[in-house]
A protein has these predicted regions:
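Charged, amphipathic alpha-helical segments and their flanking helix caps
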Residues: 1-22, 41-141
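Short acidic low-complexity segments
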Residues: 22-31
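A short, hydrophobic beta-strand-centered structural micro-motif
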Residues: 32-40
Length: 141
């Protein structure tokens, strides 16, 4: 299972009555009481050997149901629900770091990061021989 699918599972557990979870933008717009999930950035830091530390950041945008009144109340309730219930992704054994929820233009942006260390095999050509040309420089002595 990939991380995006695990995020969708965590959102579905936290908000079972959600109408839709999008992974792509739509030209028609998003229906109310739905999520749009997208990656923000990924960083890879090389470590000793062939290990890397990877940090991935994601944004989950919640669109409230506009047919109901009290949009701000819907955003407040969803902010509390996400911060209280979406803390880890058990399917991929990752904990969410730096969780933040902020209302922006009538929607709620829930951002977080995950971090993991991996062993990455890299193609390399082992040095089988070394040919040296040259010698010691003459210092004029």
């Amino acid at each position: 299972m990939d991380i995006m699918t695990a995020i969708g599972c965590a959102l579905k557990r936290a908000v079972p009555d959600i109408k839709k979870i999008y992974r792509e933008k739509t030209e028609q717009g998003f229906v109310g009481h739905s999520f749009y999930v997208y990656p923000i950035m990924e960083r890879a830091t090389a470590e000793i050997g062939t290990y890397e530390m990877r940090r991935l950041s994601y944004c989950v945008v919640y669109f409230p149901d506009e047919s109901k009144r009290e949009i701000n109340q819907q955003l407040d309730e969803m902010r509390a629900r996400l911060l209280d219930n979406v803390t880890h992704l058990p399917e991929v054994h990752l904990r969410l770091l730096d969780r933040e929820a902020e209302p922006v233009d009538g929607a709620l942006n829930f951002t977080f990061s995950v971090r993991y260390r991996g062993l990455y095999e890299q193609e390399h050509n082992p040095m089988t021989s070394l040919t040296q040309k040259g010698g010691v420089a003459n210092n004029g002595n």
